[in-house]
């Protein structure tokens, strides 16, 4: 099946095309990338709270990349699974389950169940159908959380979320030190698993489904089943990100389910580059840092500059920031030959 998937990708781009196939080896740039948050932890201690938000949002963006960038499923309601994970972890803590790591697992399971059920509706239609179904599911869950205020807190949010020290030792502090380290460890661990998935024969087959059009069904690949599986994995990862935000902030707002969060997530993925796995992490970092910096300079019109940045990157860097860097590297390599 991996060979058939590779053939499907090559067929899409031409028999002689140079198509990058998944490679599970860790590269030096990847190692350097993960050293950045470690350096930032010591170099910018006053920004550890912001750093944990970047890491969590980055994982959230990676979860969308699995769905959109790899499986090719257009989604405007991915925040639904983020919110489900956040409310699951938050409600567990409110009702006496304060242990954080087990809360992450429960949130992932609940979000994956919701994602699996939704996947049957999503994979059946085309792009427009998928867009409307995911948007509708997100709006429905937001309204459920709003109406069930006696459980979720409604528009006031879910407060009283108390999280026990991690491993019984590391308590969450106001400076965000524990939150940063906890987020980094969890995000990296989940990323390693997701990276292994997309570089596996299964991940290659999903990419073949996205690239191969009608060829994959013709060779007997279970297209719907594999798309549902990838969608479910993406939902589980989003649920973990939601649980992290609930545990590190000890609060769950109804905006975790909101359309605006899904829209911002899509912007981050476009900025970083869809279908590259690291694109979600890069896009989240650029978006949040730019938002923090620009809102401090111009609290009223900062969104204009975010939009301007997005337009520039889309027009001049095909494939987002990482796509633009790849193009520059390829051009430089040709120039040195």
Regions found by a protein language model. Name each.
Residues 2-337:
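Transmembrane alpha-helices and adjacent helix-loop boundaries
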């Amino acid at each position: 099946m991996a060979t058939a998937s590779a053939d499907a990708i090559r067929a899409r781009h031409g028999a002689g095309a140079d198509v990058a196939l998944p490679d599970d080896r860790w590269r030096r740039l990847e190692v350097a990338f993960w050293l950045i948050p470690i350096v930032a932890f010591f170099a910018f201690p006053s920004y550890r709270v912001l750093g944990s938000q970047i890491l969590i949002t980055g994982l959230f963006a990676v979860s969308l990349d699995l769905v959109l960038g790899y499986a090719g499923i257009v989604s405007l309601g991915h925040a639904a699974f983020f919110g489900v994970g956040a409310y699951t972890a938050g409600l567990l803590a409110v009702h006496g389950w304060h242990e954080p790591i087990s809360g992450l697992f429960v949130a992932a399971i609940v979000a994956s169940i919701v994602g699996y059920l939704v996947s049957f509706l999503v994979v059946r239609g085309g792009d427009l159908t998928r867009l409307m179904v995911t948007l509708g599911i997100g709006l429905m869950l937001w309204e459920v959380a709003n109406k069930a205020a006696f459980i979720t807190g409604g528009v006031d949010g879910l407060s009283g979320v108390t999280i026990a020290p991690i491993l019984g030792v590391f308590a969450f502090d106001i400076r965000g030190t524990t939150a940063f380290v906890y987020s980094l460890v969890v995000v990296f661990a989940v990323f390693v698993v997701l990276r292994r998935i997309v570089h596996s024969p299964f991940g290659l087959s999903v990419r073949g489904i996205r690239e191969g059009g009608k060829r994959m069904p013709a060779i007997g690949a279970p297209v719907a089943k594999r798309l549902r599986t990838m969608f479910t994995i993406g939902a589980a990862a989003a649920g973990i990100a939601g649980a992290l935000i609930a545990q590190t902030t000890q609060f769950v707002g109804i905006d975790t389910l909101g359309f605006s969060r899904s829209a911002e997530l899509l912007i981050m993925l476009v900025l970083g580059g869809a279908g590259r796995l690291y694109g979600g992490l890069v896009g989240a970092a650029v978006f949040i840092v730019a938002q923090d910096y620009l809102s401090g300079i111009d609290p009223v019109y900062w969104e204009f500059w975010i939009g301007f940045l997005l337009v520039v990157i889309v027009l001049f860097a095909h494939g987002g920031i990482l796509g633009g860097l790849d193009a520059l590297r390829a051009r430089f390599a040709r120039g040195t030959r």
